[in-house]
Amino acid sequence: MNTQPNKLKLSLYNTLTRQKEIFEPAEPDRVTMYVCGPTVYNRSHIGNARPAVVFDVLARLLRRLYRHVVYARNITDIEDKIIAAAKEAGVDISVITEKYARIYREDMGALGVLAPDIEPKATESIAEMISMMERLIASGNAYAAEGHVLFNVPSFAEYGRLSGRDRDDMIAGARVEVAPYKKDPADFVLWKPSTPEQPGWDSPWGRGRPGWHIECSAMIEKHLGETIDIHGGGIDLQFPHHENELAQSSCAHGHTPLARFWLHNGFVNMGSEKMSKSLGNVLLVHELLAQAPGEAVRLALLNAHYRQPLDWSDEGLAQAKRMLDRLYGALRALSDVKAEPTNDAAPDAFMEALADDLNTPKALAVLFDLAKRANTETDPGTKAQLKAALIGAGRLLGVLEMDPEAWFAGAGAASHIDGEEVERLIAARNAARKAKDFAEADRIRGALAEMGVAIEDGPQGTSWRVAS
């Protein structure tokens, strides 16, 4: 019934080649993946959450297909915005970075995002950054000037290949300041001097701190090697960040590629507008978690294909919540059978959808087909298979990991509904029915409906859920 992992071909859209390609790791049965993580100076917004959720699903799928997966997602803990936030608060930058790194982990955990295998901090790899810069200077791909180290863009003929931009677009798009010490307007900073009150490290070019782009190149080299299988991140990082990473690493490693596959998720938009602080339409993850279960926020992010822009809305989040109600309702309908989901429990059609460039909308359609069958199936053996398939498929998406009753009574219940009060009213209704006071039983059912609660009477008692 189910596809064997070693027979399933994973196809991924490679930004570098502008096409879908069959993915095979460089080393058989071992995959290396790096995803750009947060710059920790503020709370995470829904745009930060999208790559975390998307690449969490990819990591789950890779672990299903390959024996050994090494997934690294970094923490950028030295950057001008962090320095500014620390100065404004009158504290050391470590106070800011540790606080917001912790909040980021908590928020992502609430969305069901598993911790990466490696979570390197930029400040832990300063020595590796300096070593890489020294190599780039020695090869003529970088130069020192007035306490800065800059990458010599004209020295790398392939610069612009990842983003597909021409030279003028790249300079304008990066908003590169044409400082007098630059040999070329497109050259970008690898190292910059620090003032006495700014954080800094000693280097051959004086006390200073790294530029953003060199950080990821050095962390990848340190933890995963010169060439990795997959490099991921948001489409906003494609240029200049990823373009610069590619250039630095390629030149530092004798023109070997930094990554064999480059994957980028699309923007999160607020209606027809791009989400941005200047427009005042940024949605913070912790605010969304006060409105809906983390699992619903996660499903709303997976409801669109990862490469497409995602138009975020309250209705989209409410729809994701209703979808989970249906799926958990199907699991509740299967509560009378036991099933132990195995690694191959997810059905072929579901696995094929995920293996087709992580097509989560198509995979969800398969999940809902299973749920529809679960609600009408009567054969115990088939019901057990359906239950295993639902849980096994849900596990790959990072959903359906709760007990259905816990979902409807707790996480899945609307925040305004008092679960204890619902249970008290159901007990009173049951007592009224037992006493044959059907008018009172109907009155209580109506009161529950007004609260937004639907009840279902079954052979094992009365269950309830939030009404759709």
From Swiss-Prot:
Subcellular location(s) per record: Cytoplasm
Metal-binding listed as a keyword: yes
Q: How is the cofactor bound?
A: Binds 1 zinc ion per subunit.
State the source organism's domain of life.
Bacteria
Ordered alphabetically, the record's keywords are:
Aminoacyl-tRNA synthetase, ATP-binding, Cytoplasm, Ligase, Metal-binding, Nucleotide-binding, Protein biosynthesis, Zinc
Which Cys pairs does UniProt list as disulfide-bonded?
Answer: none
| Residue runs in coiled coils | none
CC cofactor? Zn(2+)
Q: Would the keyword Heme turn up in this protein's UniProt record?
A: no
- Short sequence motif named 'HIGH' region, residue ranges: 38-48
- Show the SMART domains listed in the entry: DALR_2
Catalysed conversion reaction: tRNA(Cys) + L-cysteine + ATP = L-cysteinyl-tRNA(Cys) + AMP + diphosphate
| UniProt main location, coarse | cytoplasm
What GO terms in the biological process aspect are recorded for it?
A: cysteinyl-tRNA aminoacylation
- Protein family per UniProt: Belongs to the class-I aminoacyl-tRNA synthetase family.
Q: How does it assemble?
A: Monomer.
The protein depicted here goes by the name Cysteine--tRNA ligase
Q: Which gene encodes it?
A: cysS
